[in-house]
Amino acid sequence: GEFNPAWGYRFNENKLLLDPYAKAISGKCRNDDNLLLAYDVNAPGKDLTLDDRDSSRVMPKGVVMGDDFDWQGDRHPDLQLNDLIIYEVHAKGFTAHKSSGVKNPGTYLGFIEKIPYLKELGVNAVELLPVHEYYVEDFLIQKGLTNYWGYNTIGFFAPESSYGTETSPGCQVREFKTMVRELHRAGIEVILDVVFNHSAEGNELGPTVCFRGIDNRSYYLLTGPRDAPRRYYMNYTGCGNSMNLAAAPVIRLVLDSLR
């Protein structure tokens, strides 16, 4: 690939990239020493300059997952929209506090333990706030904070790993599927809040961990002055970038994720 940011090409062979279709991600992105940035932060040209340091030691890795999960004949309840009583909920926050009384607080399995409570409320659908794998922005980490809500997706096919009960690769996938299966068994629909309008890579000064390094010009809406017509990102989302939902690869990714 080519590294010519002024024209929208941001491939850097020194930066390990996540597979956009990874079904599970092991580890979290850590921008130690700015290794996730494809450019030299100390150079006058900033994002126009190439950083040749290897990022592999601070990058999470995609996990190959089999399709052998036992759904036990699961089917979603198929309730009519006008019959839904929807409970919007954060998958972790629902049981994170010790007062929830669950064995595994703040996890997919802990969520299962509260199904009787949902039934008692008369709820027949849960709308989960983002459960895709997400990236915690550098400026938050520097302040000792985190992105609690998860609206900063980096893996549109991978359940958030920190909501699993173990750190073993793929645990989060099995436990997420178990949660969905048991909610369906209880007659509760599962609705996902998904965020396809932007990714966690931010603007031109953000990390290069996936889409930007693979095909920046296809995945994102770009703009710029005459001498650098695709250097910058259209920021309709207020999150640094906007996914190019007119491009075939992006349309395909979104539809595949929804399916």
Which sequence ranges carry the predicted segments?
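Substrate-binding/active-site clefts of carbohydrate-active enzymes
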Residues: S55, H90-L109, E113-R259
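Conserved, well-structured core segments
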Residues: Y87
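The feature marks proteins involved in alpha-glucan
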Residues: G1-L84, H97-S100
